[in-house]
Design a protein with these regions (language model features):
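Short, non-ligating residues that shape and space the ligands of small metal-coordination modules
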Residues: 95-98, 109-111
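Cys/His-enriched microdomains
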Residues: 84-87, 99
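Flexible, glycine/small-residue-enriched loop-and-beta-strand segment within the central core
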Residues: 1-54, 86-87
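Short metal-binding segments enriched for Cys and/or His
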Residues: 111-119
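Short cysteine-rich clusters marking metal-coordination/redox-active sites
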Residues: 89, 101-104
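Glycine/proline-rich active-site loop of Rossmann-fold NAD(P)-dependent oxidoreductases
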Residues: 71
């Protein structure tokens, strides 16, 4: 209830989505809160996504992470609670917080809200 999953999303095994901000055992007056997972996002195994948050396009959530806030496009978040630890391109290239590839050292930048390699 209240979960919106867009196209090309990866959801790993045992991912948990909550849908009530204040769950109580005998609460008949609960309020379901919507969560949206945008196109191309990836959520690692055993992650927990708390109600009312949005996972941006092509964002990645590390395995076992607990997401307590909205995640932006192409952002990489890991940990409990999840913390912003870098970026990831639409093609899956991991970048540090300065938008530099951890593997090749190439620099990337956001151009018209799209993450692209600098020429």
């Amino acid at each position: 209830d209240g979960l919106i999953i867009k196209d090309d999303v990866f959801i790993g095994p045992n991912v948990t989505f909550t849908n009530d901000m204040n769950p109580r055992s005998k609460n008949v007056d609960y309020n379901l809160v919507s969560t949206t997972i945008k196109k191309g996002a990836s959520i690692g195994a055993n992650a927990t996504i708390l109600a009312g948050n949005e996972i941006g396009e092509y964002a990645m959530i590390g395995a076992g992470s607990v997401v307590t806030k909205t995640i932006g496009k192409n952002e990489l978040w890991v940990g409990n609670p999840a913390k912003h630890s870098g970026y990831i391109t639409n093609e899956g290239v991991l970048l540090d917080m300065n938008l530099v590839s951890k593997e090749t050292g190439k620099q990337y930048a956001f151009l018209n809200s799209e993450l692209r390699e600098n020429d």
